[in-house]
Amino acid sequence: MYGTWFTTGKVTDLLARTGLDRVPVWVPVVLGVVLMAFVGSVRIDPALQGWVSVGTVTLLLVLNRRRGRGITVFLMMLSLLVSLRYIVWRLTATVQFSNWLQTALAVLLLLAEAYALMTLCLSYFQMAWPLRRREHPLPEDMAQWPSVDVFVPSYNEELSLVRSTVLGALDLDWPADRLNVYILDDGRRKAFHDFAVEAGAGYIIRAENNHAKAGNLNHALAVTDSPFAVIFDCDHVPTRGFLRRTIGWMMADPNLALLQTPHHFYAPDPFQRNLAGGMHVPPEGNMFYGLVQDGNDFWDATFFCGSCAIIRREAVMGIGGFATETVTEDAHTALKMQRRGWGTAYLREPLAAGLATERLILHIGQRVRWARGMIQIMRLDNPMLGAGLRWEQRLCYLSAMSHFLFAIPRLTFLVSPLAFLFLGQNIIAASPLAISVYALPHIFHSVITLSRIEGRWRYSFWSEIYETSLALFLVRITIVTLLQPHKGKFNVTDKGGLLARGYFDWDAVYPNVILAGVLCAALLRGVFGIVWQFHDRLALQSFILNTLWVVISLIIVLASIAVGRETRQTRNAPRVSVRLPVVVTDAHGRQMEGHTHDISLGGLAVGTRLATPDMVGGEVTVRYDSARDGIHVGVPARVLDARDGTLRLRWAVRDLEDERQVVSMVFGRNDAWAGWADFAPDRPLRSLAMVFRSIGGLLRRRPAEAPRALHEMGEGELPATEEKLEKQSFVLKPVPRSARHGATASAALFVAFTALVPAAMAQEAPSPDQSGVTAETPFGDSNTGVVPDALPAIDPAVADRISDAEVTRTLTFRNLGATTGPLTLRGYSPLQGLDVVVPANRVVTHAQLTLSGALSPSLLPEASAVTVTLNEQYVGTLKVDPQHPQFGPVSFDIDPLYFTGDNKLNFHFAGEYRRDCNDLFNEILWARISDMSRITLTTVRITPERKLSRLPAPFFDPNQRSTLRVPVVLPATGDRGALRAAGLVASWFGRIADFRKLSFPVSTTIPASGNAVEVGVNLPVDAEGGRPAGPMLAEVANPNDRWGTVLVVTGRTAQEVEVAARALVFSPDTLGGVASKVVSDVSLETRHPYDAPAFVPTDRPVRFGELVGAADLQGGGFAPAGMTLPFHLPPDLYTWRGRPFLMNMWVRAPGGPVVDLETSRVDVSLNNNYLQSYTLSPPGLWRKWSERLVNQHAGAVGHVTALPPWLLFGQNQLQFNFDARPIDRGACRRTPGDIHMSVDSDSTLDFRRGYHFAEMPNLSYFAEAAFPFSRMADLSETTVVLPDHPDTGTTGAFLDLMGFFGASTWYPAAGVTVMGADEVAHTPPKGDIVVLGTAAQLGGAASGLLARSPYVIHDRHITVGQRMGLQGIWYLFQDHDHAGLKDGVTANLNAPIAEAGVLLAAQSPYDSQRSVVAFTGDTPERIHDLVLSLRNKGDLPSLQGDLVLKNGDRFTSYRTAPVYTVGSLPLWLRLDWFLGHHPSALYLAGLAGAGLAALGVWAWLRGWSRKRIARDDLTGEL
């Protein structure tokens, strides 16, 4: 949309019609920037951010297909918005300062990212609107054309290199009397002087070589007088039209001090020449000269680049000449002129061409000089300071200077994953999902937008290779120059060198080779960590993420190393591919017309059908004429090869005139370099493929090359020393062009000079193709480990017979709690144990322990063993057999008298591997007890003791870990009072059971065996059938089973039954040691929201000691068993932008010389998610003494730990694991093992920064903590709707649900309201509502209660209802947090509920702040199964969204309903929440901001562009 408007003028027309075109352009810019900043700072959930990212990326891909500067500006704004969101997220959500090392590494990475973002912004600024200046016409009257001095400075270059440049300059298409070409020879070589005389060029030397090139130029300015000076490096040969196409701007704008043209290189740079895919990639310098300089021209900030430029003498002399303070005199000179108010310009037409650096090491040396110079400018003459520059110019210079600071950030990005893989420091504290949805869009937008901007000038991912090739060399230069800016000298870059054979330049790549080795080691470490080390999910993801990061770094480094594989360079005259019409005349006068394939200063290849082999060795004349360029060539050449219609010729240059003609043909054509940008537009995937191809070239074996002797390559023998001129100031004036031929002919001493022209300048015939070797990049496997075979299922042979006879059960150690694998005992951790539970109503008559495992074969048999005890009573010993380290099965009989209710089965390891001294931490000290070891118990029931004081026994055994069943007898299941009383009793049992599984099977008669609870009106209270005399509790024998007990809760009325139930659950300690008792009512205090005993208070800090006993926070040994702190929270706690809650933890370790506190640590985890590790080292001496005076925690080590809200649920557990190390006490010194470590019970949890606010419906809140019903501990704001006549299955589900509520709140459900379905129509339920029953039982009440649910249950199917009007639109455009859940609309939900349970959540139709949760299904049994799932931790993750379907063991979750909220927030936080939870609104606001900013910027840039060129539209597309 934006692109179409920007390119077609629709926006301009619309603004003109509405009058908005008169609004200043800064208004939409400011509005857009403010809106972008606001949107960029909003924090949203990673899943929602993912949708926003998908939207922005999709828009990017769509708009990127359209052309136009307007679209480009909009995409830049969009990229900046995405990057802003990323950097705000990095700064506010991913930074944790856990220790000094992590802090340093995290800050370093943040600084590198800030640098990268600044560079991105500056790049967009520079390249937002390339000016695309065209040539300005010269005056028609040539008499007005100015005189021009052409300077060719030289120091130590070869004469063969300088000759072409001088001859090309002498051949410039400019009036001869106004063209003065000078060789500025700081080498004072006589050969150069003689060449200048022969060619008719001027020659200038000076007495002292002060200030290198800048001093040379300043000296030349002092001895010449033309108003304009043109500078060419000695290898830059101009086209004939150079002056005609450039001087026009200098004449048209008298304030123009400089006009720069591109530095084009006709020879490939090291990256093109050495990389396998390099020749298909634009040269490294193309982006600067093709795009950056053009963008600088827009801002009047063109840089002088030292060559191929025109300088106004007045301007440069006005600043005291060329700058000499830095080694980059060119850029500094331009800066000084711009400070004085002079303008600069850039013409993006390559009008000269030179040689690129042939070898990587030379390229690095050149870039090191550039980096030093730019940093010197930043330190000595910072463009951001001082007067004379506009802010736009300052930013352009800031971009140039800061670019050469890339070394440290680039290295930081490459090695950052090593912090985690080698040092264990997580420097980006975020989940992989969050990193993906924030970082990847930032990178993607940057890459694609830059790809669009840079197009054919620079391919994606190649900047990384260029920078990495230099980074390690520049690190030292960067730091040294920043600290000592005056250091450093000007170094001349060698060019025109030859290589006899290819080789690997270790000097140029050895730092990257070392870095690659380190990255390979990190890669192996990452793979090892992923495959062979045990991690929780986040740790595993961190390993994967950092390993992928290493792979990316390694790809970049390998590509940069591949540049060091230098290829053979046997031609000192590189070929230029060009098709020119030529005429070849042989010795017999036969003329052959053809076209060149390539040409060079050494020769050419001509395609002609008349080429015959007999021409080889003969001499021909090559003619080329171009009237347009004023070039006429007729030069002899020798035929080297003639076949396949191609003549390969070597120039046979006879004199200087022939050489001039060759130079003119090769370099002088005005369109010689017009194809400098003829590269395919960038496509990132293709560019990436080229990177891999280049890496493959590094790994591919190169065919053997026979080295060529120098004379074979045409390199003549050079004299050992060159003849020098005297050190003095000397000026030889150039000879006018008209007088040159006579002067040259009369100079007999130069007749032999042409013999010095190297024979190797001829074009060599190409060697036969020897590339018949194919190479295939090896892609090995991922080093994933072999998955071990699954252990065979072992039948535990459980014989669970319910009778008076003996019952035998076999339990594996896995059944006893060894769920993580074998019990491992070590020297520093010699004790491991398990709990063996015997039911309270049974005694053990026989027990046998069967063990298997292994003992270290390195142990001494006579001094090593594992001792087995039960309740500190000896059971047996496992002895060491070095020949057979594995043992078992070994059986031990256990005396039944050793058993109690809860029994401790312990294994104590004592091991020695040498007779004198043993290191407890030596890895050979180990023993393992298999988790498939087992214990077999034979038990019998004992006669029950029926006393109310023993309640909840025998119905509940606290030592039991298996599922508990409490049968409930309800003679009248439809009695509301009895249901409330039974629900109250069930919730009491649920509170007692807590985390244990518990169910209440309901019947109308007493079961045939076992225990039961009977609730009802006027029930028998003794064996004789006596009736209650009031509210009464009684324990009586099961009439069907003398071993069973029935607890009777009864009364004469329904009200008395409820009184009896309240007395049972609220005052069981007052019942006494009697079998029956008439009880009185209990008065209850009014409950308040969130005061459930299970919930940690959120209005004050909570001591650990309030949650667990001090003994639970203590452990013995150097590596004691993990300590846990369970706690419950209301799941609706909300913090601003997910700020973490705080835990103030104090740990205590033994004093004295026992534990090495510096290396010992305690690991803290939350819900099995690792949080942090802390040293046990005490505080400093001053702090230690001050704490003794004022701190209750004196002697303890304190730490503050952040508890992320996303790791907190309804039920939580903090884990503390100590890992201590003993102090080295020397040889044969016993290390005390009976040490104790603890977490101080006065440590606190603080949740005060949380607000009670939640998005609903959310069944996970209900499954975790019965929310929102648990908001009131007694369920006084909860109504349960049951069928009017519930059957036993539905009633059992109701009681199970009450038990679940009691376990969630730790408070009986004394205030719950129970009503029938038929009552709903005339008495609307209050508060939050639970609906329980099948669709058939509930009738029409279900549809009314679920009126705001999107689901409809009809004809034994559940579907998404048909919503009309605005409600339907809301369903279509609502924002979802799916979290992987299905949407009922998009999934076209139409599921049968036969044999299925249905759990539904919806907003209450009676109160928008209330909720409805419905349990329904096809049969009561399915409902009952669904309620039982709430007690199964394995099923809790499946209970999410607003709809759960349970078919057998399979759960399917949906989220379809619109979100509503419960709770309250301050106004400011509510606004933040709204934007953070509506990604579509955030997305549209972001697009609006980017669009406004882009519109204003586009209009501003367009106007500035026209102003920049002084109203002369010569710039092409605007």
UniProtKB/Swiss-Prot annotation:
CDD domains to which the protein is assigned, alphabetical: CESA_CelA_like (cd06421)
Spans through the membrane: 24-44, 71-91, 105-125, 404-424, 427-447, 465-485, 514-534, 543-563, 1481-1501
Listed EC numbers: 2.4.1.12
InterPro entries: Cell_synth_A (IPR003919), Cell_synth_B (IPR003920), Cell_synthase_bac (IPR018513), Cellulose_synth (IPR005150), Glyco_trans_2-like (IPR001173), Glycosyltr_2/OpgH_subfam (IPR050321), Nucleotide-diphossugar_trans (IPR029044), PilZ_domain (IPR009875)
Entry GO MF terms: cellulose synthase (UDP-forming) activity; cyclic-di-GMP binding
Enzyme class: transferase
Keyword set includes Cell inner membrane: yes
Entry keywords, A to Z: Cell inner membrane, Cell membrane, Cellulose biosynthesis, Glycosyltransferase, Membrane, Transferase, Transmembrane, Transmembrane helix
Ranges for region Catalytic: 1-731
Residue ranges of the region described as Disordered: 765-785
Residue span of region Cyclic di-GMP binding domain: 732-1518
Family assignment from sequence similarity: In the N-terminal section; belongs to the glycosyltransferase 2 family. In the C-terminal section; belongs to the AcsB/BcsB family.
Protein name: Putative cellulose synthase 2
UniProt lineage: Bacteria, Pseudomonadati, Pseudomonadota, Alphaproteobacteria, Acetobacterales
